[in-house]
Amino acid sequence: PEGMPKNNSYWSGYNSIHVVSDATRPMMVHFTREQMLANNITTTGADSDFGILRGDSVGASIDNSQEAYIYQTKVVKQDVTCLNGYIHQVEDVLVPPGNVAQVLRSEKNTKLISRIVDYHSAPYYDATTTANYNSWALQYGQPTIDSIFQMRYFSSRSQGGVPNILTPAGAAIPNSGRLEWDLGWNQYYSSTDAANYLDDMGAILVPTDEAIENYFLPGGEGDFFIELYGAEGLENTKENLPANLDALYNKGNGILTTFVNNMIQTSFVATVPSKFG
């Protein structure tokens, strides 16, 4: 299907498919000065963690303890009292950015790492989502859908904190083919504490397409992987790199899985730039 993983046998059998990216509850991510300071995340200065995370120019900061952000959007007026609650006004329309896998797929310069990550995905029939959708469809006179699938990733930790290590047909995925955690899992929490999804989230250190090209193309530190496991008869060129990565995944006995797992981090709080080294 258009927009779904390429060169992935779990998807290639479908001419069309109804699929959701994840069936767990999306988290609303807040950045507050108090929370950042409590976790030793820098909030002021030219190279502050907050400035880098915001993607702003020099000087980005949270310098007022009352300031807060939801995703990338600033709360400009807060705690407006109403008869039945409070209003918090934000400067832009709030749009959830999607989970890690979705963002990698949508960004213009992360197509190669997204392709590699999606080698580890498969569509799983989701009876609950199918039933919920059809209940809504019947109520509002819309067509029902026979089957809705959920896009999930082979991983040592997935929804509910348990592994997702079986294919849709029930075959076991070896350790060498499992990601550290499911990059499509909206409600991720670390293995140490199921309750800390309210306090922390996962992270991934993502290489751009150019960085991956520099690594795998001739002269890069990983060009020998393509020479050993690349597609037969294809030169190691930029144009051929997607096909060569496909072959490397199929023949490389977990090399690309290890490549991704080296980037995956279990804690955002512990992975901000000021804590490197």
Pin down the residues of each PLM region.
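Mature, structured domains of secreted/extracytosolic soluble proteins
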Residues: 1-277
